[in-house]
Amino acid sequence: EGYIRNNTSIHTYLDIMTDDVEEKANTWPVMQSDIRGDGYGYFCWQPNPEYRFTGALNADNAWETYYSKILIANNVIDLLDDAEGTQSDKDDLLGEAYFLRAYCYFMLVNLYGEPYEKESADKALGIPFNYEHSVRERTYKRETLARSYELIENDLKKSIHLLETTDYTKTVFRISKGAAYLLASRFYLYKKDYEQAISYADKVLTINSALYDIRTLTEEDYVFTKENPEIIWTYGDYEVNYLSAAYRGCFPVSMAFYNSFHANDARKRTYVKDDWGDLIVGKGAANTGVYG
């Protein structure tokens, strides 16, 4: 239950907020309506982006989803000692729980907190933290950005220590030592601690340095599948496909962005698909179950 399911829409509108897409009147024949108004607030960077043209609210599932997974991680962390099993198995599960909590808070602080700057982090706003394993009515205050990153780092270090100790061999569908190193490299990159980011990235490469030769793929093939040796951890496919599936006629891939790649760049025919004359993201098929 602590893992994010692949039918959960969390980051639906993030791509709309980048320069990677453009907007236009819907020309996709399968979807008759023009739904640009649904993503207007995000595309135009409005103060309250969840509001549509009509005044209706878009569902923001990230807040609810991540905090619900944090609650499950809290239960595992606080109550695992009462469970049956070997100490090694418990330690490994505990390492996964600390990873998931760190991951969820890291995603939340980047969605709802301010960008990390060391000089202002002790005053900038971060996010609320909950370490209780039961639900009760109370108000949680937002921690500073510095404190938010400190708490995430604490969980991340505990996760790495436990997963290094157990060092279980796992599939990409379970959190592993390599996945923890990867999250640490991303965490320190965002914190602008580049030496630590490089150090953990090097640790990832000692475990898996395989590259996927996308030049061998056809236009019908997808990049993120079980055959891709670069994937270290995966938990579903929904976020990869939702924008392309639901908004392809209104928010296609930006032609300026697409044309910035060399004509012979294999990414132009593997990461992007031509669908009814519109360029859409084509990283994975809806039934691949891969989102790494």
Tell me what each language-model feature is.
Residues 4-13, 17-18, 174, 198-292:
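Hydrophobic-face positions in mid-chain alpha helices that act as interaction patches
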Residues 98, 181-188, 200:
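TPR/Sel1-like alpha-solenoid repeat signature
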Residues 95-99, 103-135:
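Extended ligand-binding groove/face enriched in aromatic
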Residues 35-112, 143, 161-168, 292:
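Conserved, well-structured interaction surfaces
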